[in-house]
Amino acid sequence: MVSSQIESEEKSLRIIFMGTPDFASSNLRALLAGPDQVVAVVTQPDRPKGRGKKLTSPPVKVIAEEAGLPVLQPTKVRTDEFLEALAAYAPDLIVVTAYGRILPKPILDLAPLGCINVHGSLLPKYRGAAPIQWAVIQGDDEVGVTTMQMDEGMDTGDILLRKIIIPSPDETAGTLFDKLAELGTSALLETIEGLKKGTIRAEAQDHAQATEAPMLSKNDGLIDWSRTATELESLIRGMDPWPSAFCFLEGKRLRLFMPEVSYQKTDAQPGAVLRAGRDGLLIATGKNCLLVKEIQPEGKKRMTVEAFLCGAKIGAETVLKTT
């Protein structure tokens, strides 16, 4: 049960923070710099990473250990032992940002002010693990973050606060990630202040308007050249930097970056390279053309098309394929 206002506006809240990736890091840093007390941090277990599969700590854990905070990394969240461990910290509030697990009701009800979540979309749009990427892929003309009172569903809780920004014309998932991380921190601090003062009122989501943003896989980046140039531009930007959009050149994977729609008319088949020059690859699509300025050949680093052409030949008869 969420209290509309704590006993005193001046009280320093005891906060448990739950999060894992870089997107959550700025929120934790802001809480550590603020008037409230982060009493513990919960994050995902360390995972093997890189070619050497070295066990690597989540970004949030690194920050927590630098601050001397206790860190919990449960493999399961639906256990009495984990609930008791959280309860021992007597939290007033639990803050969750990209933790990566759905929390059970006993945890949601543990703190007097409940659990609040910072989500990287304008809910109810893009519920799920990859809201930022999907917003770019879909070509949204406004994006933002939402703080919500968590319930047992996947991003279905009541909305506390929304903040909106307009993406730039050349926005990628990577650049938008950075902007929304900063915006999310601002929204979180404003939400906590509003909960303290009792000035924020929760509003139910319109579930009929909900859309999903499932986790992306590498294969989601495969380019279908029969789609329009506008759709492909959004796809390539939404897949940058990961998992990246790709096609095949002479049987080898070619990742594409920095696209721009061109309205040059052509009767060439989709995927045909119309021009390869210093400004990029001009490629025919299902509607209009696409100018791609940077690429990453298989086994090599990302580079400009101009740099690629210094050591490779690609002409007007080249066709980029899906296999």
Swiss-Prot record:
SUPFAM superfamilies named among the record's database cross-references: FMT C-terminal domain-like, Formyltransferase
Domain of life: Bacteria
Keyword Repeat appears in the UniProt entry: no
GO MF term (any one): methionyl-tRNA formyltransferase activity
Catalytic activity: L-methionyl-tRNA(fMet) + (6R)-10-formyltetrahydrofolate = N-formyl-L-methionyl-tRNA(fMet) + (6S)-5,6,7,8-tetrahydrofolate + H(+)
Pfam families, per database record: Formyl_trans_C, Formyl_trans_N
Cellular compartments per GO CC: cytosol
Binding-site positions, (6S)-5,6,7,8-tetrahydrofolate: 121-124
Keyword annotations: Protein biosynthesis, Transferase
Record field: transmembrane: none
UniProt keyword annotation of Ribonucleoprotein present: no
InterPro entries documented for this protein: Fmt (IPR005794), Formyl_trans_C (IPR005793), Formyl_trans_C_sf (IPR037022), Formyl_transf_N (IPR002376), Formyl_transf_N_sf (IPR036477), Formyl_transferase-like_C_sf (IPR011034), Met-tRNA-FMT_C (IPR044135), Met-tRNA-FMT_N (IPR041711)
EC id: 2.1.2.9
PANTHER family hit by this protein: METHIONYL-TRNA FORMYLTRANSFERASE (PTHR11138), METHIONYL-TRNA FORMYLTRANSFERASE, MITOCHONDRIAL (PTHR11138:SF5)
Purpose of the protein: Attaches a formyl group to the free amino group of methionyl-tRNA(fMet). The formyl group appears to play a dual role in the initiator identity of N-formylmethionyl-tRNA by promoting its recognition by IF2 and preventing the misappropriation of this tRNA by the elongation apparatus.
HAMAP family in the record: Formyl_trans
NCBIfam families in UniProt: fmt
Family: Belongs to the Fmt family.
Name by which UniProt lists this protein: Methionyl-tRNA formyltransferase
Gene: fmt
